[in-house]
Amino acid sequence: MALHQSLLDLSELAPHCQSRATARGLLAEAQDILRNAVAHQDNEIELSHWYSHLLVDIVRSPGVNSPVRLTGAAARGDQLPSMPVEWIGQDSDLQEVFSDVGLQAHEAADSIAARVDAGLPLGNGGEQALLEEALTKRPPTLKMVDGLPDRDAAVDIKATLLSPIAAIARWAAPGPRPTVDRLAIGVERAVLTATDAESLDLAWRTGYALELRRWYERVSDRPATLRDLPPLDRTAYGSACR
């Protein structure tokens, strides 16, 4: 599905941003346009790629010209507005640019995951370290009651679904690319089976749709339980967690 012209127009402006004040305006407008796209049920993965590239272009633009190197979801092409923008390096003013429009942003903690997402060399023993990091992200088993997911179980889409899958994909295919692409490459490298990659891809897309919808509804930063989710979202979340 082709992106709406309004998204394409804004993405053309981002690399030519001439001031940090203009950057704030572009970031605010991006959220408004993104909300419209979500309302029209545009593809969540395509929207995250668009939003990620927009952030990268703004940070590199003449008006911002930040010395930092983006990492995390933005560098991978997985960024959503409910996720913190992360970078390697120091720029105290940059955090303010994002926070002024309601976005979380901060310098990333030093880790192999941050370095890999930023496109820095993996180094000796890097893949083993990524595997160990992925294992630490393994979420707890979803609590069941009478054969169904416990409706009082806490819902944390990023910690339970997105972060563990991103860590597996990072190990399967190190490099700054979207998680869905990493999973596909993991199959080509024979470190993931096609069945495993397909299951992870489906869970990732499900989690992304849920996370983006909660941001659209302005509840992504609120604690929630399965009981709080609409029935279809509750079913989708439970299936993805399995």
What are these regions (language model features)?
Residues L34, V38, L122-R242:
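Conserved nucleotidyltransferase catalytic core and NTase-mimicking acidic/glycine-rich helix/loop elements
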Residues A73-A74, A105-A118, I185-G186, A224-D228:
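A glycine-rich phosphate-binding loop feature that marks nucleotide/adenosyl-phosphate handling sites
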Residues M1, P15-A23, N43, S111, ...:
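Intrinsic-disorder/low-complexity, polar/charged segments
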Residues L80-S82, L103, A203:
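Short coil/turn motifs at beta-sheet boundaries
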Residues D42, S52-D91:
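Active-site nucleotide-donor binding segment shared across nucleotidyl transfer reactions
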Residues R69, I88-T141:
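Conserved catalytic core of two-metal-ion nucleotidyltransferases
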Residues H53-R60, S92, E96-S99, R170, ...:
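A broad, structural surface signal
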Residues M1-S66:
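N-terminal regions immediately upstream of nucleotidyltransferase
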